């Protein structure tokens, strides 16, 4: 594949702008298309507002960061994280490109029209069959997701052989964020058939993100390391979160052998598969995922976007839930915003709510977002101080609702098929006396 000097970015068929890559400086130059700038669709309202963004713009502070890779946050959100990025790296290796030769623009061209959200990138890399809707098999994808990290030579040989199972995982696994293996699927509830969710599927299919149960990670013992049964745990957390008023997309478990894969309906797609523009908090406000930020900063993003009180209360409920339920994976890419075709922004449903606490963990020993200048050892006074500062009403009532829901952990977990040893370990860590 030849070097890509310039790529174009599209939204709903309209040219948004163009971008080039400066290898020496390590960051991209971006420019809005004049016609799009007059459209009033503020796709990046905080960092590149249309009214104030003219000519070529770049963000040198984003250079060589894992979160942004030298790109504007608007564009960086379309890059896959560890799992999807590793898939793309292996595909490029077979095209003769080593990892240090692959630019972020190359990766965006590989993603093409298959990014999360609604942005599309041209020219798109040609991958045989990747844009076709065909049936896929979860068991095969699970085994392959393991080989990507454990048996690289075997995985590359399958790519060379143009193995159908490799094509399947390239179809479904290269766009989603996060470090752990997942797939973008289309699912037929009547037949249980699973197809690639990266392209338009036939009638009767809906669009989901599937997280592989951790059975392929047999060397991992900590709950935070994605053991078999993690799907059941996340499903129980979904049940507890929605029970205390947190808005989430529909979630399910997909049984497959001894595993239960966690599925969540995509909120960046309409029921008919139309795309919705999406930005994470990291992308929309350039809040680097790998740098400590605060819930107060997130509330500031909601305020700058002009969101309503209901959205502020939603964020407050999520904050309280994350504290009580020990979800320390509360970084800035785990909160998102949606823009409709009129340019109106809203707070996206909650996602990635799961137990994530390890006292010895580098990232999970403390919360990624601070509140009231603390990252752990919170008191009710800390939660109430945040509520007072941002104007949340009935904060004590919200805290009690969350406590009541999370206190049901043993019963909810058992109903959701969580293993007894996981029920016990998580139960001991929950903060139920705040």
Residue ranges and their predicted role:
Residues 1-332, 336-434:
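Phosphate/dinucleotide-binding and metal-coordinating scaffold of catalytic cores
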């Amino acid at each position: 594949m030849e070097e890509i000097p310039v790529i174009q970015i599209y939204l709903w068929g309209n040219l948004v702008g163009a971008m080039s890559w400066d290898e020496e400086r390590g960051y991209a130059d971006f420019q809005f298309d004049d016609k799009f700038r007059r459209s009033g669709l503020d796709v990046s309202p905080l960092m590149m507002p249309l009214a104030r963004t003219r000519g070529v713009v770049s963000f040198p502070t984003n250079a060589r960061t894992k979160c942004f890779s030298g790109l504007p946050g608007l564009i960086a959100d379309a890059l896959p994280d560890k799992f999807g990025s590793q898939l793309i790296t292996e595909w490029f290796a077979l095209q003769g490109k080593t990892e240090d030769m692959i630019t972020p623009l190359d990766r965006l061209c590989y993603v093409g029209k298959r990014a999360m959200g609604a942005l599309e990138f041209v020219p798109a890399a040609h991958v045989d069959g990747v844009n076709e809707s065909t049936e896929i098999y979860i068991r095969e994808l699970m085994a392959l997701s393991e080989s990507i990290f454990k048996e690289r030579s075997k995985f590359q040989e399958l790519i060379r052989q143009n193995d159908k199972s490799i094509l399947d995982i390239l179809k479904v696994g290269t766009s989603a964020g996060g470090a752990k293996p997942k797939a973008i699927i289309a699912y037929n509830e009547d037949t249980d058939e699973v197809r690639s969710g990266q392209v338009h599927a036939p009638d009767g299919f809906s669009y989901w993100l599937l997280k592989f149960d951790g059975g392929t990670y047999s060397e991992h013992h900590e709950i935070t390391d994605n053991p078999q049964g993690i799907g059941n745990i996340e499903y129980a957390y979904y049940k507890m979160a929605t029970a205390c008023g947190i808005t989430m997309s529909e979630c399910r478990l997909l049984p497959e052998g001894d595993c239960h894969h966690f599925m969540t309906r995509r909120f960046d797609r309409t029921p008919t598969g139309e795309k919705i523009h999406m930005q994470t908090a990291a992308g929309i406000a350039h809040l680097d995922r790998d740098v400590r930020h605060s819930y107060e900063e997130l509330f500031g993003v909601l305020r700058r976007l002009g969101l309503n009180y209901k959205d502020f209360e939603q964020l407050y409920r999520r904050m309280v839930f994350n504290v009580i339920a020990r979800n320390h994976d509360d970084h800035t890419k785990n909160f998102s915003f949606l823009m409709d075709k009129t340019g109106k922004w809203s707070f996206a449903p909650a996602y990635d709510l799961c137990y994530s606490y390890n006292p010895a963990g580098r990232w999970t020993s403390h919360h990624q977002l601070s509140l009231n200048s603390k990252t752990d050892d919170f008191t009710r006074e800390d939660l109430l101080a945040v509520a007072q500062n941002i104007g949340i009403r009935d904060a004590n009532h919200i805290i009690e609702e969350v406590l009541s829901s999370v206190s049901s952990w043993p019963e909810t977990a058992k109903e959701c098929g969580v293993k007894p040893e996981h029920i016990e370990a998580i139960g001991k860590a929950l903060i139920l006396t705040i």
